[in-house]
């Protein structure tokens, strides 16, 4: 069991309290298949902003011993081309549980950048009565027959950075007026990129513990209770080393508190290419075996 306040019994470092994200602007639904907001007006059209940080992120990552041995296989299927349609998939070990469709924004030494728009086709694992993982206790969920259900993403637009190293991805969120409002640090298994029969994708496993970060760089852990609850069922849970997950979050928080890339304002003014068309349905092969 993880120590409630930190790794190995250490007190957790906590920033000032972060108010409920988007309390005045946009709802971030806990279950992506239900209760999403109504379709928003599109973000203002314009050229993508991919300004480079004054601190070279590739050098920073390479110099950080916490990232050694965590190199992702993003180059194996790359380089990805801007505008390509991509499926971003989450697994619990080998079982597919979540898929969203988006576009490649860019792919270079800083990592793979994706745009996941509101309204994109997606699939999510649900119980036979239409409930999701977060709609019931984990002890009940693991006894449920489930099915992958296709729907659309009702949450907000997401700009996502999958870095070349590290067990995480960083997400940018804007309100419906196009104002940057949050970073989200998603702690996850190092991603694997792939190409198969003309389809491109990125596969990972969510590690459940996450972080919200405001533009002022205050921060707050998210979903600690879910991690704690699920660790009581090791034969069913997909996070083998919760201490390593928290340590990865703490590593990212050092960058947050230093105002270093990617938390230095890079891409906060991003706008998607207006020529990108959201697909009407998930592409063929979206449910292929894990790469």
Give the location of each predicted region.
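Hydrophobic residues embedded in beta-strands of well-ordered beta-sheets
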Residues: 111-113, 180, 219
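Compositionally biased, low-complexity flexible segments
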Residues: 1-17, 37-39, 47-49
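Structured beta-strand/loop patches that form or line metal/cofactor-binding pockets in enzymes
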Residues: 152-209
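Short acidic-glycine loop/turn motifs at beta-strand connectors
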Residues: 107-110, 177, 213-216
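Low-complexity, intrinsically disordered or signal/transmembrane-proximal segments
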Residues: 17, 22-24
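Charge-rich, low-complexity N-terminal segments
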Residues: 24-36, 40-155
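Cysteine/selenocysteine-centered motifs that mediate thiol-based redox chemistry or coordinate metal-sulfur cofactors
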Residues: 247-291
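A hydrophobic, small-residue-rich beta->alpha segment in the mid-to-C-terminal subdomain
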Residues: 207-255
């Amino acid at each position: 069991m993880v120590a409630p306040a930190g790794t190995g019994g250490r007190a957790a470092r906590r920033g000032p309290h972060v108010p409920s994200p988007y309390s005045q602007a946009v709802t971030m639904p806990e279950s992506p298949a239900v209760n999403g907001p109504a379709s928003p007006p599109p973000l203002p059209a314009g050229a993508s902003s991919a300004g480079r940080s004054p601190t070279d992120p590739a050098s920073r990552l390479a110099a950080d011993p916490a990232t050694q041995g965590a190199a992702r296989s993003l180059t194996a299927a790359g380089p990805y081309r801007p505008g390509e349609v991509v499926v971003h998939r989450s697994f619990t070990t080998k079982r597919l549980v979540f898929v969203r469709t988006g576009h490649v924004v860019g792919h270079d030494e800083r990592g793979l950048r994706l745009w996941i728009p509101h309204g994109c086709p997606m699939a999510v694992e649900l119980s036979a009565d239409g409930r999701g993982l977060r709609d019931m206790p984990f002890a009940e969920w693991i006894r449920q027959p489930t099915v992958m259900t296709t729907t659309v993403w009702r949450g907000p637009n997401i700009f996502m950075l999958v870095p070349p190293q590290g067990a995480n991805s960083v997400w940018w969120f804007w309100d419906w007026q196009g104002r940057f409002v949050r970073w989200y640090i998603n702690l996850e298994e190092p991603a694997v990129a792939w190409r198969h029969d003309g389809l491109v994708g990125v596969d990972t496993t969510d590690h459940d513990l996450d972080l919200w970060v405001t533009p002022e760089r205050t921060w707050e852990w998210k979903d600690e209770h879910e991690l704690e609850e699920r660790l009581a069922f090791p034969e069913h849970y997909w996070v083998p080393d919760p201490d390593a997950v928290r340590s990865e979050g703490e590593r990212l928080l050092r960058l947050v508190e230093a105002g270093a890339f990617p938390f230095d304002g890079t891409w906060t003014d991003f706008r998607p290419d207006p020529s990108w068309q959201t697909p009407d349905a998930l592409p063929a092969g979206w449910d292929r075996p894990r790469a």
